[in-house]
């Protein structure tokens, strides 16, 4: 289910990359991304925000306990595909134009937020994470599936070299961002992480190191200094 949003366009356009990304999704799922996507979303409930929803590949995998999904996507071609995907989903989905650095949600309005292959490409990662923390209620979860800086020196060096040209070719994507450190620096508590390479090949491409994880906006102190989870 979906509703359209009359907000003015953000003007974020990557027409060539958007079409390549949309066509690559099913192939990536066949290679194993589908398993990671399902793990990313398992157990979510309540009101959820997905930033950089792309063409809506995640929509079919949200559990029925999700009562509303606010799907934010700035690229017009991908957003149109997401609206179509939302119409076929089993949960209520509101697809909107918007960017990670100014999320269209009130403070503490979400039970969870999802970032799937998006923190690599936001212009200001710290600001995007601050926005995600803002929209989460205390105790709310940030679910993330991202490609990140390698934990081996050789591949990390290759990533830094690749990033000279990679963002221009791949919709602003960076291969060498230390996203886990950025998440903790934004005030989140890391709950769980799993690092892996995808695709897992003998000669790994720069964007192959990935992390799948859960972080939490810390709960607010209770009346007597104890922590309360709403």
Model region roles, listed by residue range:
Residues 24-47, 57-61:
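Conserved alpha-helix/loop element of class I SAM-dependent methyltransferases that forms part
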Residues 49-102:
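Class I SAM-dependent methyltransferase SAM/SAH-binding core
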Residues 101-113:
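A short acidic, Gly/Pro-enriched loop at the edge of an enzyme's catalytic core
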Residues 111-124:
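A short SAM/SAH-binding and catalytic strip from SAM-dependent methyltransferases
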Residues 126-141:
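A short glycine-rich, Lys/Arg-flanked "PGG" loop and its adjoining helix->strand segment in the class I
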Residues 143-165, 170:
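Conserved class I S-adenosyl-L-methionine
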Residues 172-187:
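Short alpha-helix
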Residues 194-230:
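Core SAM-dependent methyltransferase catalytic element
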């Amino acid at each position: 289910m979906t509703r359209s949003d009359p907000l003015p366009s953000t003007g974020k356009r990557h027409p060539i990359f958007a079409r390549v990304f949309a066509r690559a999704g099913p192939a990536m799922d066949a290679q194993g991304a589908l398993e990671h996507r399902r793990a990313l979303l398992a157990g979510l409930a309540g009101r959820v925000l997905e930033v950089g929803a792309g063409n809506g590949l995640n929509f079919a995998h949200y559990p029925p306990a999700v009562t509303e999904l606010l799907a934010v996507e700035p690229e017009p071609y991908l957003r149109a595909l997401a609206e179509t995907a939302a119409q076929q989903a089993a949960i209520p989905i509101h697809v909107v134009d918007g960017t990670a650095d100014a999320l269209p949600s009130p403070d503490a309005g979400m039970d969870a937020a999802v970032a799937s292959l998006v923190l690599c490409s936001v212009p200001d990662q710290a600001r995007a994470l601050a926005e995600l923390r803002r929209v989460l209620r205390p105790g709310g979860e940030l679910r993330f599936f991202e490609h990140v800086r390698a934990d081996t020196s050789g591949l990390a060096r290759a990533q830094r070299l690749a990033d000279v040209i990679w963002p221009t070719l791949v919709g602003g994507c960076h291969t060498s961002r230390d996203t886990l450190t950025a998440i903790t620096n934004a005030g989140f508590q890391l709950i769980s992480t799993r690092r892996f390479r995808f695709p897992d090949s003998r000669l790994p491409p720069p964007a192959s190191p990935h992390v799948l994880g859960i972080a939490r906006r810390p709960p607010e102190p209770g009346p007597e200094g104890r922590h309360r989870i709403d």
